[in-house]
Amino acid sequence: MIATSLATWFGCGYAPKGPGTAGSVAALAIAWLLNTYAGVSSIGLGWLALLLAIPGIWAADVVARSSGVKDPQIVVVDEVVGQWMTLAGATTLNWKSWLLALALFRLFDIWKPPPVRQLERLPGGLGIVADDAMAGVYGALVLFAAGWFNLY
């Protein structure tokens, strides 16, 4: 029950269309709340992504093993890790950086440039989460560069 709740990010993974995007949008909503009401910075969101990755790997592994599917669509905790990792690259958090972070993470998560695709092949929950974490790193680098050049 706990593993399923965490893996599906409290039900977001059950979205009938685009559960990955639903997980990413939910991650942005929680990140916005953390930033606005708790003062969590973009770097803080990156640290939270790393902390979430540990139980996220476990939860993803439990759900994958119980379903018999290597990377079940309902598992979206990996999207949360990747989305928060992307936000770590923001030089400032404003509506433009939030939207750009969403677009960049989804781009790299779907495109899967090397080594994202290779990380996806790791066993169990590690492979489920690691590829999205790396997609998040790519997103963070591009988001940082865009901020550096005042593009948002």
Each language-model region and where it sits:
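Alpha-helical transmembrane segments of multi-pass membrane proteins
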Residues: 31-32, 49-58, 101-110, 143
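Membrane interface segments of multi-pass transport proteins and intramembrane proteases
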Residues: 34-47, 115-125
